[in-house]
């Protein structure tokens, strides 16, 4: 079993790492193609359903994820891609919190058919990171396990 690490590296940043069983090309596709992304991104144990997933993975392109969380209105996450380097790097803004949201940066480093995935969440302030809590970061272990399952199915 692969180990996912979650580390608060500064007052403004959390870093999640895991080596997954698949080439960087497939991992990049899993992050950028909606039909693949929706198969692994939401931890099953959270009981949330992804209602819609739009990913326009190019610099300046937009993404939007809408979840059914059992309430009256869906919960949405959205932002803009600021860096898209095929098979090695992605970065996007997280704009659902208003001005000054966090930025997510994903780097991929392939070695021997396996890929080290590093996800950096950088917040505008310590208070913003504190407010975000650790729930989403803690769910990343399950999320990455689901990514590994998907990569196995894709071969």
Regions found by a protein language model. Name each.
Residues 24-25, 57-58, 82-88, 107-116:
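A short, structured loop/turn motif at beta-sheet edges
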Residues 27, 37, 63-65, 81, ...:
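Hydrophobic pocket/interface hotspot
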Residues 151-155:
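Short, highly charged C-terminal tails/helix-capping segments
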Residues 1-47:
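Hydrophobic ligand-binding cavity/cleft-lining segments
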Residues 13, 91-142:
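Beta-strand/loop substructures that line and gate deep hydrophobic ligand-binding cavities in soluble
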Residues 15-16, 35-74:
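Short beta-edge strand/loop motif at the mouth of beta-sheet-based domains
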Residues 18, 52-55, 77-83, 94, ...:
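Hydrophobic/aromatic beta-strand elements that line small-molecule binding cavities or substrate pockets
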Residues 11-17, 24, 50, 62, ...:
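Intrinsic-disorder/low-complexity, polar/charged segments enriched in Ser/Thr/Lys/Arg/Asp/Glu/Gln
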